[in-house]
Each structure stands twice: as structure tokens, then as C-alpha cells.
């Protein structure tokens, strides 16, 4: 409940960067991580970690020498999830545009993004996707959640294959690309 109030407070103040009014449901989190092929040496990046609900779900699935880097730009949410840092997980208070300052080119196995693409200007959104693609291995996986299909064409233009799933058991319901 406290997390929902935190989301609502910051969404009302800064809707362009905090676009969710509640934390994501366990159903959405599960749908987001199911496609990730966890193995003993993954590098997973999370963009827009929020209150850490997916961060925690990803941490439970990491195996062996796998690592994860979670980006959260908003200070209140970053401070809330800092305690999740450990030898497998680094929490970063930085912009997704700076992903290559934290990972090598073509080194990331999967990126899970909670970024509010619909609220980000086209030039910045394109720059983020360009950096994401530079960071990914050849057989990479990019998972993005949104509350609408607004950016479907944008994602189709930037990625070879885009599949859409719907999660009705979330407030509001969400789409997963």
C-alpha cells in the first residue's frame, strides 16, 4: 500500500518520468520475465526499476555467475531500492541513455524496460533504443511494457520481431512487447 501511495504521489508530480500510479501486479511481473532464458552467465539490464518489484523477481531467477544492472533515474525510487544491490545486482541512479557507461557493447542478454516511452520525446526515445541495441548481444531479448499500443509502430520500425501480449490483471491493464 505504501508503494502505491509513493507511485501516486510522484506520478501526479512528474507524470513524464513516473507514469504509473500504482506498482505493477505480480501477473504483469511474471509475464515480463517468463521469456527470459535464464542461464548461469546472463547479463540482464532493467530500465526504470521503480520500486523494485521486477528487480526482486529477476534476482530470484538469476543463476550462477549471472549479473544484473537496474537503472532508476527518479531519486525517491532509487533510494527505495538501493538495498537490493549485492554481488549479482547493481542499482544505478542514471539515465538509460548512459547504458554503455555500465556495460560493454554487445554484452547484454536481456533488457527489461519499464520506461514510459509514450511520454518520452521521439529524439530521446530513438537515442535510448539506439543505445539499447548497441548494448545487446546478437541473440538478445528486449522486453518493454506500456499501457497502450502508442509505440507499437515505433518498436516495429526499430526491431526485427515485435510480439505483443496483453495483461488484463494489472491496474491499469498493460501491453508487453
Q: Which residue ranges define each predicted feature?
A:
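Conserved SAM-binding strand-loop segment of SAM-dependent methyltransferases
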Residues: 87-97
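Conserved SAM/SAH-binding beta-strand->alpha-helix loop
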Residues: 74
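Conserved beta-strand signature within the Rossmann-like core of class I S-adenosyl-L-methionine
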Residues: 136-146
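A short acidic, Gly/Pro-enriched loop at the edge of an enzyme's catalytic core
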Residues: 101-111
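Class I SAM-dependent methyltransferase Rossmann-like catalytic core
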Residues: 3-36
Amino acid at each position: 500500500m505504501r508503494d502505491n501511495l509513493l507511485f501516486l504521489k510522484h506520478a501526479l508530480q512528474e507524470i513524464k518520468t513516473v507514469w504509473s500510479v500504482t506498482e505493477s501486479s505480480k501477473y504483469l511481473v511474471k509475464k515480463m520475465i517468463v521469456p527470459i532464458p535464464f542461464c548461469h552467465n546472463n547479463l540482464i539490464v532493467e530500465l526504470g526499476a521503480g520500486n523494485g518489484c521486477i528487480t526482486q523477481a529477476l534476482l530470484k531467477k538469476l543463476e550462477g555467475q549471472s549479473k544484473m544492472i537496474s537503472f532508476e533515474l527518479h531519486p525517491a525510487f532509487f533510494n527505495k531500492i538501493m538495498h537490493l544491490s549485492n554481488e549479482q545486482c547493481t542499482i544505478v541512479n542514471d539515465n538509460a541513455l548512459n547504458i554503455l557507461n555500465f556495460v560493454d557493447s554487445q554484452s547484454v542478454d536481456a533488457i527489461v524496460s519499464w520506461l514510459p516511452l509514450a511520454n518520452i520525446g521521439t529524439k530521446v526515445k530513438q537515442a535510448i533504443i539506439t543505445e539499447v541495441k548497441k548494448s545487446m548481444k546478437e541473440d538478445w531479448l528486449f522486453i518493454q511494457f506500456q499501457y497502450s499500443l502508442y509505440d507499437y509502430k515505433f518498436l516495429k520500425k526499430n526491431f526485427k520481431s515485435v510480439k505483443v501480449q496483453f495483461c488484463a490483471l494489472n491496474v491499469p491493464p498493460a501491453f508487453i512487447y
